Structures are given as C-alpha cells and as structure tokens.
C-alpha cells in the first residue's frame, strides 16, 4: 500500500472518499463544522437522528451529491475526545479500511490523522490502521472477484503549519514496517502442506537477496554436527527435513553490540505422539508465527537501514507422529549438554528454542529475545489482548514494555521465580520438558532460561496474540503478524 501527503483544503479536495474522524461527546473536531455547513447541516442531522453517534470504530458512508469535491465522506467514530489515544486512532483507521473493502474503493484521502495534535505519533497510528486493516488473504480462492483492497491513501494537511516534522519520512518508514507485518501474516496464513521448513528457508533466502541480508541454512547433518539433538528429536516424526535458518544484518560497526532474535518455527504441530484433540488442529499451522515475526522484523530492519547489528535465528521443523517420532519417556541431550526427559511431545517448541538459544551464545549478544506461540496457558492467563513476557534482565524487559505501549502490541510480564523450576524437576534427567498445567506458561519460560547463561534475555509468548478468531479493526480475522512492530520499535529505541 502506498501513502502520500498533500497540503490542501479538505473542503476543496477532489477525491472518491474523504475519511473524517468524529466524536461522541459534543466535541466537533477539526473541519466538522465547515463540512457540516457545506452539506447543509447534513452531518448534524445524522447525529440528531442517531444514524451515527461517533462511537469508537463505527462508520457511516455518505454521498455528498456534489456539495463537496469529495464524492463521499466516510465518518469514523473516535469515541470520547479525552480518551483518544494512538491505539484508538489506529483502530479507527482500521475500521475505515475494513468498511471500504466491499465498496471497491482502492484510493482514499484522509484527515483522520488531524483529529489529534500529536504529530508523527498520530500520523504513524493512522497509516498503520489503514495498511493493516485493509489486509486480506485469499490466495487459494478460485473464481474470486479481483481484489479491492486499498492501494493508496493521501493524508491531507490543511496548511503548511501542520508539517512540523518530516512527514514523508514517517510515511515511508511506517509503510515499510506494515509491509513486513503483512509479509509475516502471509507466512502464517499459508497452509501446512505448503509452508514446510524448506519453504520457510526459501523465504529467508528471498528476503536476504532482496534486502541485503546474509542467509545461512543449516541442514539436518549440520545440526547433528552441532549437537542440536533437542531440535532434531522433534523433527524425527516427519518426512519433511528440519531447517535452521540464520539471517544476519550488519548495520552497526564491527565492534558494536549484537541483538539476537529467535523465532519458533514449528510449521505444523499435531502434538506428535501426545496427539492434540481434533477440534481446532487445523490452526496449528500458526505454530511458526514466532518465526514469521523474526523474518518480518529482519526484513524491516534491513529496509529501514537501522544502525544496529541484528541476527535472526529460526529453528524450523514439523511435529508429527510417525514410526521414527520421539516418544514420552525419551531422554534427549540438548546442544548445551543438559539432558531433558520428554514427558509430553506436545511441549516441543521449547525443544527447538533451547538449542537455538544456546547456539545464539556464539554471537555474544548484548540482548537475546525469543518469540514463540509457546503455551496455551498464556492464552488462558492473558487472552488475546497481551503477549506474555518473561526475562532475566530488568532493563531489557522494561524496554520491551515501552516498545509494546508505543507499537500497540502490548506485553505483560510474568514472574520467573525459582520455585517454578520445581515443576520441571526430573528423577532421571536434568529437567523435564513440561511441568503440568499449574503455572505452565511460566514453567516453560523457566525451562528456556536454563539455556541462555548470563546473557540478557527475554521471552515473548504470542500464543494468544498470533491469531484473531473474530477480527478487530486493524487485525482482521486470521494471522496478526504480531511481534514485528514490537521488535522493530524495540530495535529502533536502542542507542
């Protein structure tokens, strides 16, 4: 999707649709009275007749019948003026994009971003809402009508004084990040018979070639040479070979710090021998959403040319039952040398991650962040509205919380007390791979922290935020691409 800025009077601007933000509390907002007058009191009449109230995310499409150069106005509810923030504005823009899809509008103009005098922050939220709210995935539908998704949005500025910051830079950077989110959504949306580990590796090579990253893919033999036995154990039940994808971006100096991102890449999770219930298993194609987030983040970091050194590690495998599958009761020696008793083959993501986290130590990272659809328990604890956060470094977790608030991809920190380690104790190995239902999200995080040494580390559990069952304004039903905006915001905040 493309974005442009234009200094023009909204009352004189020629366009198919002009998006206008409206409130519920009597606060008219900028340009409301002028537009109302041009329409002969039409906007006031709509409010009086309760056809539209300004309620958050509610929309009303009006034909101007030639009274304005804009053919139609799309009124978008912003709720109460005093409660308007960036995420509400992001939602409103997403609601506008969603409402225009069935109408077949490919281009719009907007003064929605002028509803709140916050400069770049407001513009960013508006652009994100339009770009992410207009997303759809219909690659496999046959006999479909041509797509009518939004392709272009013009952000109007009534006067040069509104341009007290580099608008074009904000538009370009925000569009770049949203492209990366859409890329991640596309990956997660692919069916499991298409997106296998080798497909994910090929996508890594493609973005590396396009954006100037280096890409290395370790095959099964090289993983064995590196003693990645936990990862390889998970892959044993599938005919699809596992892949270990390494993406490197060197935007900083040779001696500058390195941030390593690790994304869980279970391209389909049946649970293995500890088979999942039939109901909902088709959604287990999204168990590589962490890998998609890391790949999308690496794409955005390179496109933005950040002055950082960033490495993305993606352990990719399928978890299936089969004649060679790993079994409950097996003991696996991880790359770190620590032994793991397998009590549940459906607790497989942490086995991929533990070898990847240990491998990451080779880069001597200043910060190590893993992101994974790790536990159903996190969905129970936080629902679909926040990503679970754990870590061993207060500065790192604080930075991720800040990035979550700015990006709208909020996180909530859970404790990582030693007592949770008692749940993972094994009689015959160094630890078990699962500790039962009590505190399951935290015990999973505790398991991971055993493989990071003294490195500053954080774990993001996106099991609840990677997929939308019903859809929300800028997060349509399906894959959300969560993690990309959060991680990019974190990386942009590094000194």
UniProtKB/Swiss-Prot annotation:
It holds the Pfam family Peptidase_M17_N. InterPro entries: Leucine_aapep/pepB (IPR011356), Macro_dom-like (IPR043472), Peptidase_M17_C (IPR000819), Peptidase_M17_leu_NH2_pept (IPR023042), Peptidase_M17_N (IPR008283). The active site is at residues 276, 350. It catalyses: Release of an N-terminal amino acid, Xaa-|-Yaa-, in which Xaa is preferably Leu, but may be other amino acids including Pro although not Arg or Lys, and Yaa may be Pro. Amino acid amides and methyl esters are also readily hydrolyzed, but rates on arylamides are exceedingly low; Release of an N-terminal amino acid, preferentially leucine, but not glutamic or aspartic acids. Gene3D superfamilies: Leucine Aminopeptidase, subunit E, domain 1 (3.40.220.10), Zn peptidases (3.40.630.10). Mn(2+) 2 binds at residues 264, 269, 287, 348. Binds 2 manganese ions per subunit. The keyword Manganese applies. Its cofactor is Mn(2+). One of its GO terms (molecular function) is metalloaminopeptidase activity. Presumably involved in the processing and regular turnover of intracellular proteins. Catalyzes the removal of unsubstituted N-terminal amino acids from various peptides. The keyword Metal-binding applies. NCBIfam families: PRK00913.1-2, PRK00913.1-4, PRK00913.2-4, PRK00913.3-5. HAMAP family: Cytosol_peptidase_M17 (MF_00181). It comes from Geotalea uraniireducens (strain Rf4) (Geobacter uraniireducens). CDD domains: Peptidase_M17. One of its GO terms (cellular component) is cytoplasm. It is an enzyme of class 3 (hydrolase). This is Probable cytosol aminopeptidase. One of its GO terms (biological process) is proteolysis. Mn(2+) 1 binds at residues 269, 346, 348.
């Amino acid at each position: 999707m493309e974005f442009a800025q234009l200094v023009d009077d909204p009352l004189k601007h020629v366009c198919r649709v002009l998006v206008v933000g409206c409130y519920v509390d009597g606060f008219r907002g900028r340009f409301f009275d002028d537009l109302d007058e041009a329409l002969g009191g039409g906007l006031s009449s709509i409010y009086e007749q309760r056809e539209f109230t300004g309620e958050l995310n509610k929309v009303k499409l009006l034909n101007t019948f030639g009274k304005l150069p804009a053919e139609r106005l799309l009124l978008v509810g912003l709720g109460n003026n005093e409660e308007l923030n960036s995420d509400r504005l992001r939602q409103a823009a997403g609601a506008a994009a969603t409402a225009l899809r069935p109408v077949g509008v490919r281009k719009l103009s907007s003064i929605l971003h002028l509803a709140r005098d916050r400069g770049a922050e407001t513009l960013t939220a508006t652009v994100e809402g339009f770009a992410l709210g207009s997303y759809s995935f219909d690659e496999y539908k046959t006999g479909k009508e041509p797509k009518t998704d939004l392709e272009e949005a013009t952000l109007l500025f009534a006067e040069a004084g509104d341009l007290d910051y580099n608008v074009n830079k904000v538009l370009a950077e925000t569009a770049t990040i949203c492209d990366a989110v859409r890329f991640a959504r596309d990956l997660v949306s692919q069916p499991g018979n298409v997106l296998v580990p080798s497909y994910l590796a090929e996508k890594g090579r493609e973005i590396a070639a396009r954006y100037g990253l280096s890409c290395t893919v370790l095959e099964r033999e090289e993983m064995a040479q590196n003693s990645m036995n936990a990862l390889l154990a998970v892959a044993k039940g599938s005919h699809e070979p596992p892949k270990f994808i390494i993406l490197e971006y060197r935007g900083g100096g040779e001696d500058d710090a390195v941030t390593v991102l690790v994304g869980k890449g279970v391209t389909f999770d049946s649970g293995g021998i500890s088979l999942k219930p039939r109901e909902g298993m088709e959604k287990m194609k999204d168990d590589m959403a962490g890998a998609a987030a890391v790949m999308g983040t690496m794409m955005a970091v390179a496109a933005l040319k950040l002055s950082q050194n960033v490495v993305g590690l993606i352990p990719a495998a399928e978890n299936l039952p089969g004649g060679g599958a790993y079994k409950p009761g097996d003991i696996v020696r991880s790359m770190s040398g620590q032994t793991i008793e397998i009590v549940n083959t459906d607790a497989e993501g942490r086995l991929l991650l533990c070898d990847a986290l240990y491998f990451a130590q080779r880069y001597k990272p200043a910060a190590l962040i893993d992101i994974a659809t790790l536990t159903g328990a996190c969905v129970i604890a936080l629902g679909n509205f926040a990503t679970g956060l754990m870590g061993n470094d207060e500065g790192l977790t604080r930075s991720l919380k800040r990035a979550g608030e700015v990006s709208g991809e909020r996180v909530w920190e859970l404790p990582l007390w030693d007592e949770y380690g008692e749940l993972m104790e094994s009689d015959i190995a160094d630890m078990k791979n699962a500790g039962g239902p009590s505190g399951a999200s935290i015990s999973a995080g505790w398991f991971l922290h055993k493989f990071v040494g003294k490195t500053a580390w954080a774990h993001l559990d996106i099991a609840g935020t990677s997929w939308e069952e019903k859809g929300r304004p800028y997060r349509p039903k399906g894959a959300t691409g969560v993690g990309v905006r959060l991680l990019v915001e974190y990386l942009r905040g590094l000194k």
